[in-house]
Regions:
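Flexible, compositionally biased loop and terminal segments
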Residues: 1-150
């Protein structure tokens, strides 16, 4: 019989639902570096980060959080290679389309902050559409910050 137990996952801490914060903000940073450290393309890190954010957003909605803000793409991010920027824009499009398909059920409201004008026109239109569809919903408000900074 081994002396040490196999490494076990620590149990998730209990959530005190009587003392939840009203607002949580997340800065999407380090996903490309995370991928590079694992020998993966930076775009794989962005995809993993987007999926992790979706998991977090779902949890926040489920526990009744009022506001969730994600700083997703800053003005500095335009300096990245065009392929990487394109991949990030593609991920944003993918997740917004998925969000739209679930909005009525989830009652999530989405707002967008930052200068959206440099984004591809299709993405600008999708942001406006998402905002319009969700404007009357009363669930968690997800604020997406795009092309912010200065």
């Amino acid at each position: 019989m081994p002396f040490f137990k196999a490494k076990e996952q620590a149990p998730a801490p209990a959530v005190d639902f009587d003392h939840l914060p009203r607002h949580i903000a997340i800065i999407m940073d380090g996903n490309g570096r995370w991928a590079q450290k694992r020998g993966l393309p930076r775009t794989a890190g962005h995809a993993a980060g987007a999926e992790n954010f979706r998991t977090i957003a779902t949890y926040c909605k489920d526990i009744g959080l009022e506001y969730l803000t994600v700083y997703a793409f800053s003005t500095e991010n335009w300096k990245r290679p065009a392929e990487e920027v394109g991949a990030i824009m593609g991920l944003l499009k993918k997740y917004l389309l998925e969000a739209i398909s679930r909005m009525e059920r989830d009652r999530v409201k989405m707002e967008f902050f930052g200068d959206l004008s440099p984004l591809p026109q299709e993405l600008q239109d999708l942001c406006r559409r998402t905002r319009e569809i969700s404007k009357g919903y009363d669930g968690c408000q997800v604020n997406v910050c795009l092309n912010y900074g200065g």
